[in-house]
Amino acid sequence: MHILIVGPRQVGKSTLIQKVLDAVGKPVCGFATKREDALYNPELGYPIYIYPAHGPRIQTSDNLLGYCHDRKPDVNTEVFETFAKTLQETPAIGSVILMDELGFMESHAEQFKATVLKHLDGNVPVIAAVKEKNTPFLDQVKNHPNCKCFFINEENRDELTDMVIDYLKKQF
């Protein structure tokens, strides 16, 4: 079963996932999204970029998902759809697919969402950070029959790391 780390903003989902991946030591493919606070624009807001799981984190218009200003996203859906093609590539044997993070910005990116769900239907282990929001897509992900949700909060995040490491090791 795939692993979903579900929780609110800034609770440690990505940190927990990185600790788990470091402990398991398997090749990682997939993606990570990041709000680049240092590139804040007063008119546009905080830029959000999508990066391959490994490699340099270079910010270009090709991986700029959009901006968040006053918690209101301005989304470039085409970037999600283009990245879906990369995500469709067959993962290396013995690897883990990272999806950090699944949220509301991809709500209208149909190809991207279909690719995520295809991986959840598959056998290559997935570990994903999932925003604690209710959207049709996120509800579909959280209720996927091949997924186990681990709900993270400030009180349980340290002990949850070991539980998730043990769980992921059993997937190989």
PLM ranges: what are they?
Residues H2:
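Walker A (P-loop) ATP-phosphate-binding motif of ABC ATPase nucleotide-binding domains
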Residues L16, V20:
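Hydrophobic positions on the alpha1 helix immediately C-terminal to the Walker A/P-loop
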Residues K13:
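Conserved lysine of the Walker
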Residues Y67-L117:
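Phosphate-binding/switch loop-helix module in NTP-utilizing enzymes
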Residues R9:
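The conserved Walker
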Residues D22-D70:
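N-terminal phosphate/diphosphate-binding loop that engages ATP/GTP or pyrophosphate donors
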Residues I5:
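Hydrophobic anchor at the beta1->P-loop junction of P-loop NTPases
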